[in-house]
Every structure is written in structure tokens, then in C-alpha cells.
Amino acid sequence: MEHTIAVIPGSFDPITYGHLDIIERSTDRFDEIHVCVLKNSKKEGTFSLEERMDLIEQSVKHLPNVKVHQFSGLLVDYCEQVGAKTIIRGLRAVSDFEYELRLTSMNKKLNNEIETLYMMSSTNYSFISSSIVKEVAAYRADISEFVPPYVEKALKKKFK
């Protein structure tokens, strides 16, 4: 049987339990999961690329088939480099789908061999976004149910 590799891209600024839910649910469907931290030219990050990588690595260390990498450029190029045939994207709501559909269409034009798999977030995470978590953290509210402990500590330090 063919060794299957999937890529889960994102800015992960920072990683949340919503992201982790999608990553964990993907691990038993593919032999290898690459969490690909994309440097997004449109988003100015709260955490540096290196900090985001560290937060993700700490959050997924219990998942042996997950690798964390950074990449700037076209996602389909990264997929080709690592031999991935699938991109996994998490969806929280219909509004996410419209944006994701445009990305998927472009990726298909660039490389017809790569498929995109959409996973609905679990209902208890459907309202969580990195932006909302950061906003709540800035007011020093409890964010423990939204992010792993290591990330919570890093956010508290950022918003001292």
C-alpha cells in the first residue's frame, strides 16, 4: 500500500485546540502529516515564525506521525517536495468555505494531482480562531479551554 502524506497548512498564530482537533483527527487517516507553517504576507504575526513552530511542535509531540515545517511560496510546490497528494483544511462555518473554495480552485489549476480534503471542526471548537483567542488573552481572560497549556503560557507572556 502506498505511503500517504497530507499537508495541513496555516499561519497558526497561535495554534488552538481547533487546529489540534483537525491535526489529531487526520493522523489516523494518513501515514504522515506535515503541519506547514506558511509565512503569510497578508498577516502580521503576533508570534514570530520560530515561535509558532515551537508552539506547534510542543502541541503535537504526542503525535509520532506529525512533522512541523515552515514554508514560503506556493503550497502546491511544498506538497510536491514532500510527496503529499492531499491538503487538509479545517472549516468552522460556511463563510470559511467560500474563501477555501477559491484557494482550492487555484491549487487545482497549479497542480491537478493534489486534492483538498475539508474537515469540519468539532462543534465545541467551531467558534475558535487564533484572532479571537488573542483578543481574549489581551484582556487577561481565561483561555485554557481554547489553547494547549504551553500556548496559554506563551500568550500570557506576550500580553503582560
Curated annotation (Swiss-Prot):
SUPFAM superfamilies listed in its UniProt record: Nucleotidylyl transferase
Gene Ontology BP annotations: coenzyme A biosynthetic process
Record note on biotechnological use: PPAT is a validated novel target for antibacterial therapy against Gram-positive bacteria.
Gene Ontology CC: cytoplasm
Pfam families: CTP_transf_like (PF01467)
The protein's required cofactors: Mg(2+)
Positions contributing to substrate binding: S11, K43, L75, R89
Pathway, per record: Cofactor biosynthesis; coenzyme A biosynthesis; CoA from (R)-pantothenate: step 4/5
Compartmental location: Cytoplasm
Keyword Nucleotide-binding belongs to the record: yes
Group of enzyme by EC: transferase
Claim: Ligase is one of the keywords in the record: no
GO molecular function annotation: ATP binding; pantetheine-phosphate adenylyltransferase activity
Enzyme Commission number, as recorded: 2.7.7.3
Chief place where the protein resides: cytoplasm
Transmembrane segments: none
Positions annotated to bind ATP: 11-12, 19, 90-92, 100, 121, 125-131
Assembly, per entry: Homohexamer.
Record protein name field: Phosphopantetheine adenylyltransferase
Taxon lineage: Bacteria, Bacillati, Bacillota, Bacilli, Bacillales
The gene coding this protein: coaD
